[in-house]
UniProtKB/Swiss-Prot annotation:
MF (Gene Ontology): ATP binding; proton-transporting ATP synthase activity, rotational mechanism
Name under which the protein is recorded: ATP synthase epsilon chain
Family according to the record: Belongs to the ATPase epsilon chain family.
Cell location: Cell inner membrane
NAD recorded as keyword: no
Quaternary assembly: F-type ATPases have 2 components, CF(1) - the catalytic core - and CF(0) - the membrane proton channel. CF(1) has five subunits: alpha(3), beta(3), gamma(1), delta(1), epsilon(1). CF(0) has three main subunits: a, b and c.
Membrane topology: Peripheral membrane protein
Residue spans crossing the bilayer: none
Organism: Idiomarina loihiensis (strain ATCC BAA-735 / DSM 15497 / L2-TR)
Keyword match Cell inner membrane: yes
Function: Produces ATP from ADP in the presence of a proton gradient across the membrane.
One CC-aspect GO term: proton-transporting ATP synthase complex
Amino acid sequence: MATQTLNLDVVSAEDKLFSGVVQTVQVTGSEGELGIYPGHAPLLTKIKPGMVRYVSEAGDEELLYVAGGVLEVQPGHVIVLADVAVRGDELDLQEAEAAKKRAEEAIADSGSDVTYAEAIAELSRALAQIDIIRKLKR
């Protein structure tokens, strides 16, 4: 019988946020949402700013915010190498909304392609954080 769990490691440059056994993992990939279950095919993909959601072996759901990175799926093992990773309950709604407002203002006032691209990236990160905070409040 095939195993019904996966080993998950979520690592950023600053910290190892999680290492343990989980039932499922959901990640925002570069092409959309990815649901990873035991037996998933090997995969290597870029991840966008967004949520990493996992269900622990005990059935508890956890949400993390990642600001991009790489996802590697191997038989029985998932690794998230994040540029920045923060536990969902450590995110600050007021700070995220202020970052969203700054990014929107920068987009409206951008004079160069570089400034515009940076503002779009900042807006994407802020919206992802706000989304995670709202999901945690449900």
